């Protein structure tokens, strides 16, 4: 089995998994616990610890996704998409800290999507980074101050 083919299949699986999760979040079809569990499963499949990534500053996140100085587009995209989904889930929830959680997650997602080249994820069936950045900007602007 070619390593590149294996990696591409894993990325495609993650894309499908996260696209389905986005639909469940927007449709209100999952509890917060189920969403968090699926996000952690996706991160683990990608070799990442999402709880750790959520707690990191942008500078530390950069070290996680670019340990040799060059951004790993797969890891960057995965963390960006997970952060975006985290923001969606928080924005649509009724929690007391939901606005702050959504803002933090969307800002993290915007930072990470901004590091990606425009065509980094177009083969995954998910929007390109520029389209995601537009959606994030709209969502950030719609949050109460």
Q: What is the predicted function of each stretch?
A:
Residues 1-79, 111-115, 138-145:
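N-terminal alpha-helical interaction modules that lie
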Residues 13, 84, 91, 113, ...:
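Residue-level detector of solvent-exposed, low-hydrophobicity positions
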